Amino acid sequence: FANFAKLIRDAQPQPNPTPEPAPDELTALEPRGRDFGAVETQLGAMGWTGNVFPLRGQGDNAKAPAVALEPMLKTPATHVADHCGHDEPMRGFAPAPGFMVLDLDIPKGADEGKPDGYGVLRASGVGIGDPALVVRTGSGGYHLYYRIPDGVDIPQIAHKGASTPLSGLPAYEGGVPIDTRVGGRGFVVMPGSSMPDG
């Protein structure tokens, strides 16, 4: 994790490489058609804690919280705590401190065709370690769930590096397609969520 954080902070301009092919070696849980209760049980069985809450589920802000986010991020949970009713099509998961989700995105807009988040990590030589859970996102990216080792501080990063290339990779106008969703500071769309576009 420290190497990854340093890589993002210390990026230097380099020539543009060929985009990486889609990874074959990642076995990922498909996000659609999952029962929320089963996902919560799986996270709990892995020792994860955090808060599950409803997302708006419609329009341009479909992934935005439908409730106040701060309590979901800051309220300690001793288990996977579900703050939802039974009919929300989209839910968010805010991991507790000590956990994080690495969000490897697919570049969009002006960055389309450039290496995706997984390709950036492969090209950097940092690697992905051994995530507890890998989820394929609705857009084709990945969410990698990790327990943060004691004493390691992971920064919360959301497409940091707009117009700043990483070593050996092209510049990204919309930011490097990697986010960290750190416990107590961020959240992800939970597997089982039904996006408005399917």
Predicted feature residues:
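Conserved phosphate/metal-binding and DNA-contacting active-site motifs used
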Residues: F1-G198
